[in-house]
Amino acid sequence: SITCPASVNGLVGFKPSVGIVSRTHVVPISSTQDTAGPMTRTVYDAALLLTAIARPDQADPVTLEAKRAPDYTSGLDTASLNGVRIGVLRGAVGTRTDVKALFE
């Protein structure tokens, strides 16, 4: 678990795609979903740590063919979102007006 423990402790948790980070020494539960990832105080720190740990590992063959970014902090530049479309599933927002206002 990464994202739930991080959220209840006021941290940033990032769960990378399987193969980006080695699963060596991770207690196996699901070979298609197991992954390790950073829990940090800031988004920048999570991206920096992911850059450091995202490496191929001979002991974890899934990591050998994964495509990785050379520097995950480069995606934090606001210009990196130019041209990106972000969708909001309106039905999942609920009926509370304060929650709806946050999505607008």
Question: Can you name each region flagged by the protein language model?
Answer:
Residues 12-102:
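A short helix-breaking turn/cap at a secondary-structure junction
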Residues 1-10:
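FAD-binding core of FAD-dependent oxidoreductases
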